[in-house]
Amino acid sequence: MNLTQIWKATLSALQTQTSRHDYEALLRPATLLSLDNGAAFIGVSSPGQKEGLENRLLMPLRNALARVVGYPVQVQVLIANLNSRTEPSPSLTLSNGSRLMSDPEPVVAETPAPALTPGNGTGERVVQLDLASAMRSGMLNPRYTFSSFIVGSSNRLAHAACLAVADNPGQAYNPLFLYGGVGLGKTHLLHAIGNRVLDRDPEINVLYVSSEKFTNDLINAIRRQQTEEFRMRYRNIDVLLIDDIQFIAGKDATQEEFFHTFNTLHSAAKHIVISSDRPPKAILTLEERLRSRFEWGLIVDVQPPDLETRTAILRAKAEQMSVHVPDEVIDFLAHKIQSNIRELEGSLNRVAAYAELNRAPITIETATAALADLLGNQRRRRISAEAILQIVSEHYGIEVEQLRARNRSRHVVVPRQVAMYLLREETESSLVDIGNLLGGRDHTTVMYGCEKIAEEINSDSRLRSEVMAIRERIQMLRG
């Protein structure tokens, strides 16, 4: 494996062990400069990133690297200058006389080999790298497009709304507010909007930014007495894509500035798309005037992917990686990893890296070994299909036998379809198994019931609450 492959496998392992914030802000922008005689040098772009890695993630990083390469590793974090372009060099010498060896195999274009420059006056040597990372600079990531987004019942409404905004910015759904748990594709959709807008009209001014970067830019502008420049930057754009807005809650100065930025853009028919991990009304300490503005347009819930969507995501990821993953392994991962897309893709990365390092075929046994720590944390007592039927029937106040009967009245049909959906999601039962369990129904009837519930929980808040309540009881029973 070359440096790029080692670092990719390391990030895949860390992706499921760290918070989204630490992964995106500290790990993802970093790069593996060299690995020689058990010494790994990690390049970062700022003192803050260096401090964050060293204080919070050094041990997990060291352990993940060691697992990938198969031997103990010492990690040193170096400040990198990401703004200047340098020609690749075969090696470089640090101030202590040790050498950083460049990758002996070809490296992707955005990570050419490093070269040293004189000190920056802080006593630190600076490694200059051309790492054209869109996420790092607040620009758009070209990999996040609508064509690379897997659409399923859990995100179909969000996808359609984002596509409508991208095709007609400044028109309907302004603002568009996306909310949902970590790793469900909200950031992907924000970037997809920006990329499509620019594909259609390169002259449109689009800005993607996290709420944390907005806050940091404001703080720096105040400190440098450049608030007018800050306002010029944020209020002279056509499409503002702001991620994780919940982090401005409780920050009075940031909320004040964003309030006026929002008003300026909205009154000029500029489009604003916002993401959050919760709906506006659930963001505590968010000013009421901002909350009301977020509710002016369309609010869309992004749900965790269902089994079929998880399977499609894994197949697309395997194709993107140019790795053959047998169907039974895809099914195994789709059933085991249910929380979010990021963990799902990260798990496939880990399995592929584990198989490559051990020169082993990708099998269920290989996947189980590669994900031993993750699956160990998720290990739960199995719950029987009969127990799920009992929980569903108790929730709706009917008998289990009514779920199996041919009764087609609505007060039984909906609970029966909910039972089909939960049996498909929470157990490894096939459609045929579920049909047999529910009075010998055809597998196509079961498929229809599952799809109907998966579709309706996106638009029917009452049904969504009922399914969530039943799922909570299932989790409690599992322990």
From Swiss-Prot:
Residues 1-71 are annotated as: Domain I, interacts with DnaA modulators. One of its GO terms (molecular function) is DNA replication origin binding. Keywords: ATP-binding, Cytoplasm, DNA replication, DNA-binding, Lipid-binding, Nucleotide-binding. Residues 139-355 are annotated as: Domain III, AAA+ region. Residues 71-138 are annotated as: Domain II. Residues 86-106 are annotated as: Disordered. Domain I is involved in oligomerization and binding regulators, domain II is flexibile and of varying length in different bacteria, domain III forms the AAA+ region, while domain IV binds dsDNA. This is Chromosomal replication initiator protein DnaA. It comes from Chloroflexus aurantiacus (strain ATCC 29366 / DSM 635 / J-10-fl).
